[in-house]
Regions:
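Membrane-embedded alpha-helical bundles that constitute the cytochrome b-like, heme-associated redox core
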Residues: 1-215
Length: 215
């Protein structure tokens, strides 16, 4: 055991998993925060069609440039789509890669009867759903950026028969994001020290489900 051997040992440490973990957590946090903001902005329709109209025009730059530039919406959607791909690539290394692995995972999850393990399984399932449905939604936003507003969005939802997709997407993204933030807080030790960690975790779980239910 000498300085040279220790230096060689350090040089052989594979830091890629740690970096991928960091990328996964950071991109997931960014996507979850974006989703919360997105849901609050979309809910402007509850204040009336004029409120949602002004929100849509704001993101087209009307109040900055004096005229709408739907390309700004395309750029935002493309950036979110790229971030989603980065997050998916970083997370996929932890997901089962075959039917046999999924079956084994489900069997172990049932035998463990551990709530947080079930949450991870739900996150895997909702992640698979989001890989398809979120891509469809973002592609629509990128290719039809001017069709966002109280009338256009309602027409797409009803006449375009997109409501089943958006309904499944809503539940999937809220479950995935809420569980992800809960697990992120636990993983990186962001909770303050407590004399009763179990009670603290239960409070965090209740907070997570309350926020998910709110959105």
């Amino acid at each position: 055991d000498n300085p040279t051997s220790r230096a060689i040992a350090r040089s052989r440490i594979d830091r890629a998993p740690a970096w991928l973990d960091l990328v996964q957590g950071a991109s997931g946090l960014a996507l979850a925060l974006f989703m919360w903001g997105h849901m609050l902005l979309v809910s402007s329709i509850l204040l009336g069609k004029d409120a949602m109209y002004h929100v849509a025009r704001f993101f087209e730059g009307v109040y900055f440039f004096g005229r709408p530039y739907p390309q700004l919406v395309t750029g935002i959607a493309a950036a979110i789509f790229l971030l989603m791909i980065v997050h998916a690539v970083a997370a996929m290394r932890r997901m089962p890669a075959s039917y046999r692995e999924y079956r084994t995972l489900f069997r172990h999850t049932r035998s463990l009867r551990h709530a947080d393990t079930w949450l991870w399984l739900i996150q895997v399932a909702t992640g698979l759903v989001l890989m398809f449905l979120a891509g469809v939604h973002l592609y629509t936003m990128m290719t039809h950026p001017a069709d966002i507003g109280p009338y256009e969005s309602a027409d797409r939802f009803v006449s375009g028969r997109m409501w089943p997709l958006y309904l499944v997407l809503l539940f999937a993204v809220e479950l995935h994001g809420g569980i992800g933030l809960y697990r992120l807080v636990l993983k990186w030790g962001l909770l303050p020290r407590s004399a009763d960690p179990r009670a603290q975790r239960r409070r965090l779980s209740r907070l997570e489900w309350s926020i998910t239910g709110f959105f």
